[in-house]
Amino acid sequence: MSVAAGDKPTNSRQEILEGARRCFAEHGYEGATVRRLEEATGKSRGAIFHHFGDKENLFLALAREDAARMAEVVSENGLVEVMRGMLEDPERYDWMSVRLEISKQLRTDPVFRAKWIDHQSVLDEAVRVRLSRNVDKGQMRTDVPIEVLHTFLETVLDGFISRLATGASTEGLSEVLDLVEGTVRKRD
């Protein structure tokens, strides 16, 4: 088998994921029909479902990929810096709209919610490790448990993503992030 032929399934899978991300972001989970997924990916329904089985598994694959990517960025830079990056260059964070769809599915689909917990745990662990590391360095406040700081940052992130994805004004958001950072940092 040639190298090019060997690469084709991986490329096809990645092309499907990229097209599906655009489709879910534009039309939402419910609006991302098979026809729209075919158009967005440039692949047949047979190719799409060969790789992912069904629409839910395709969506979960996107969610898993996005959670892993975000966990990597969080572990290096912290969640507030991720939000600063989103504010400065929202196009780089194409997963924002998909994350909104994930939130909607979590509210309405208990089966999806059960499957999502494993994917979210990757991101949660990255945030906890980062917070713990910063506590050990003496940079974080210690009068509240790490879990409370984590929940606070996650809540801010969800609102931040919602605001950016819906096109609401970003005026003052940089100062809001300064406030968030000051809130979780050690007080002198």
Curated annotation (Swiss-Prot):
Effect noted on mutating R141A: No effect on DNA binding
Indicate yes or no for the key word Transcription regulation: yes
Query: What taxonomic ancestry is recorded?
Result: Bacteria, Bacillati, Actinomycetota, Actinomycetes, Mycobacteriales
| BP-aspect Gene Ontology terms | regulation of DNA-templated transcription
The UniProt subunit note reads as follows: Homodimer.
Name of this chain's protein: HTH-type transcriptional repressor AcnR
What keyword terms does UniProt attach to this protein? DNA-binding, Magnesium, Metal-binding, Repressor, Transcription, Transcription regulation
Instruction: Give the protein's biological function.
Output: AcnR negatively controls the expression of the aconitase gene acn. Binds to the imperfect inverted repeat in the acn promoter region.
Which PROSITE patterns has this protein been placed in?
Answer: HTH_TETR_2
Q: Which InterPro entries match?
A: Homeodomain-like_sf (IPR009057), HTH-type_TetR-like_transc_reg (IPR050109), HTH_TetR (IPR001647), Tet_transcr_reg_TetR-rel_C_sf (IPR036271)
Residues binding citrate, per UniProt = L79, V80, R130, N134, R185
Q: Which Pfam families match?
A: TetR_N
> What residue ranges carry the coiled-coil annotation?
none
UniProt lists the gene as acnR
Q: What is the effect of changing K43A?
A: DNA binding affinity is almost completely abolished. Still forms a dimer
Effect of substituting D109A: No effect on DNA binding
DNA-binding region ranges: 33-52
Highest taxon of the source? Bacteria
- A single GO molecular function term of this UniProt record: transcription cis-regulatory region binding
Q: What happens when the gene is disrupted?
A: Deletion of acnR leads to a 5-fold increase of the aconitase activity. Overexpression of acnR leads to a 2-fold decrease of the aconitase activity.
* Chain ranges passing through the membrane: none
Q: Which parts of the sequence belong to the HTH tetR-type domain? A: 10-70
Question: Quick one: which residues bind Mg(2+)?
Answer: E181
